[in-house]
Every structure is written in structure tokens, then in C-alpha cells.
Amino acid sequence: MFAVIIGLSIGIGLPMQTAINSRLRNAFSSPLLSSMTSFTIGTIFLALVALLITHSLEIGVDLIKNQPWWIWVGGLLGVIYLTGNILLFPHLGGVQTVIMPIVGQIIMSMLIDNFGWFYSPTHALNIIRILGALLVLLGVFLAISAQKLFSARKEIISDNSLLQNSNRNSQWFWRIGGIVTGMFSASQTAINGHLGTVLNSAVKAAFVSFLIGSIALWIIVAVVEHGYHFSPAFNRKFPWWIWIGGLIGALFVLGNAYLVPLIGTGFTVVIVLLGQITGSMLVDQFGWFAAKRNPIVPLQVLGIILMVIGIVLIKLF
């Protein structure tokens, strides 16, 4: 039960991070620069926590030599997932940009559980777990798109008008890309979980993941943005909380690294996903962190119920 509470909590926090980082993005006028700043703040936070708990950030050379190469790429996969979402939105619209990576997350998490990839705990795939995964996907779709179905399809029409300007084959390319980025996200969860076991510290694993991701983003920003332009964020007055998105993201990665060895990748992914969808609905309902208010509709509640049923099936079978 404690693991479930952690998973739900970090999942609920993720949409709050998204809302916060959207304001940070406005401050910098650059999604990449805001992501780099968020990652860097999260890295510093995790370094301090790791020093407080383990009294060291050192990783032995022998450990690096004796472990598989993929154990260090979790942070890079996180950056690919983050950047992928930025690239997907103009081509797929709001709904599909959320749905496609989630499809990839669930598919990959079930495969990781079934085959024990990345040294994750093994949970054999069966028809009941597949049914549970399908219910989770249906619940996600209802929870995300219900407001659009209830609002005379205005936003869906807007999305469709955007998509009509794109070639259909191109749309499928981006849909597959969305699924692949979701699979990378699930892989990151499993990899960081094993890294936490190897380092005997989930905190240190989260720090390594964030550090590598931060380095990658600093390089990407230097190439794409031709430098680091921080002054716009300080020339205008913004609320203090625009800087805490990285802390929430750090806790998210830390929570995942802690949970995977305990409950497996598949269950971790779907529990966190339930928290994520619930958090999104709360942000919409109450307009937290200056987000636009979108009151919850009954179909979204039905979506949450279906997700819970699906999660129970995945857990019990």
C-alpha cells in the first residue's frame, strides 16, 4: 500500500510540474531552455539529497566497467521523451500527443515485465493483464478527451484542422514516433530502477539520471539556441514557484527508481499513470499554477474508474 501511495503521489505531481514548466517556458520563451533549467535545478536538488543520505556522490570505476552500458542511458531516454513531446504536438494535436506515448509506455512496461528486461522483476503476460492494460488505455482516453467531447468538439475541431494540413502518412510517422518515445519512457523507469539496485541508492540513481539528462540538454541548447539566454526570465516579475518544476521532476524520477525493484515496471507505470491523470484533472478543475480552468465532467470520472479496474487486473494477475 505504501508503494501505491508513493506511485500515486509522484504521478499527481507530474501535471503540476507541467503547469509550472509552462510558465517557466513563457519566462524563457524557449521550451528547450526551460527544460534545461528545470533539469539542472532537479540535478542540484538530488545531489544535495544524495550527499545528505549517502554522504557521497562517488561511483566506483570498477562498477562502471562491470555494468552494462545501458544502465547509464536513463537520463538520455528522459530527454528524448521530453523533446519528443515538444516535437509531436504541432503534428498530432493535444489529444494524440498525450495518448500515443501512453500507449508506448503501457506496451513496453508489459514487455519488460514479461521478459524481465533491464533485470526487472518478471511478471508473465496473460490475457487478464492484457485486458487490464486495455482498460487502462480506455480510461486514459476518456479522462483526457472527455472535456473535448463535452464542449461541442471545439478543441477536437481545432486539433483536426491542424492535422488536415499534414500528410496522412506523416501523421502515422509521428504517431509511431509518439509510441516509441513512450516506450523509451517506460525503459527509463526500468533502467533507473536497476541502477538504484546496483548503486544501493534510489537517490543516487535519480541523481545520475538527472545529471546525464542535464548535460545532454546543455549541449542541445548550445547547438539549437546558439547560446544560453537567461535574462528574459529575470527581466520580468514571475511567481517564485516557476523554479520548482525541477524539484517535482526529481521526486518523480526518484520515486520510480525506488518503486521498480519493489513492484515491477508494469505496475509502477500504470499506478503512476493513474496519479498523473488524476493530477491533470485536479489542475484543470482548480486552475492550479495559473493553468486554464476546465471543470471535470462525469465521463472523466468513468475513465478513472476504468483505470482503477484495469490496474487491479494487472496487479492481481
What is the role of each PLM region?
Residues 26, 30, 84-100, 197-201, ...:
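Structural motif at transmembrane-helix junctions in multi-pass transporters
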Residues 181, 185-193, 197-198:
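Extracytoplasmic gate region of multi-pass secondary transporters
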Residues 15, 19, 47, 75, ...:
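Hydrophobic/small/kink-forming positions within alpha-helical transmembrane segments
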Residues 125-146, 296-315:
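Hydrophobic transmembrane alpha-helices of multi-pass small-molecule transport proteins
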Residues 1-14, 62-77, 128-138, 174-179, ...:
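Structural signature of hydrophobic alpha-helical transmembrane segments
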Residues 1-9, 23-26, 32-36, 40-70, ...:
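Membrane-interface interhelical linkers
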Residues 12-16, 20, 69-91, 184, ...:
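Hydrophobic alpha-helical transmembrane segments of multi-pass membrane transport proteins
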Residues 101, 107-127, 278-298:
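C-terminal transmembrane-helix exit sites in multi-pass transporters
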